């Protein structure tokens, strides 16, 4: 994959739009999950305060960029929230941003050994250059720098495998190359869930649940046209990449994919 610095900047700015995309507009509809598997509870734990302490999230900047945080969201960032992670349209923006921060900063085999590791223009991608709510710099300053989670080698392996085979309708890149906010966020979510014991099947279901939350129109289309797909199949390049969705789903379903949610 070859790209010049200027081309990378143009791509990143085109994806991010007017700056950091924080999920100011959430499309209507609940997540659509064909072939749903019941998932174990997932918890934030001390992820929030660890991200804040590392400077990946500056709470004041995040509040300003998003127009404010709820009391529950503030409690999550302080580490005072003890309930399960809620996954619904009201939580969509906060999930996107917090998982984005985690996927960006967490030291991982995906970032250290995947295509991002040799991508010279990584600092100018939407997932890095678009992250402007860190304390000390843009997203590339934190990229693959912090041990927020302590993943075992087996957990790293399962995340790498699922990241290699999950796509998003805004581009043709797998989660293994998290070049936008959605890719980085899904990586962070997979890492957190794997660290809490999720197996491969459960990770695919979680990934589909989140993707369908962030791209509701696209996954409504997939569910309507291909109701019998497993989560792993629905997330494959054939259906969930931009070109795959356009080829196999868009002919029958109106919709569009954008990192601007």
PLM regions and their residue ranges:
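N-terminal Sec-pathway targeting helices
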Residues: 1-15
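Polar/charged alpha-helical tracts
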Residues: 5-6, 71, 75, 127, ...
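Hydrophobic membrane-insertion alpha-helices, especially the h-region
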Residues: 12-24
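Membrane-interface motif at the C-terminal end of an N-terminal transmembrane signal
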Residues: 22-33
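Amphipathic, positively biased hydrophobic alpha-helical segments used for protein targeting
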Residues: 23-25, 114, 255
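Acidic/His-rich structured neighborhood in mature extracellular/periplasmic domains
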Residues: 36-184, 199-202
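A cross-kingdom marker for long, charged
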Residues: 168-169, 178, 184-261
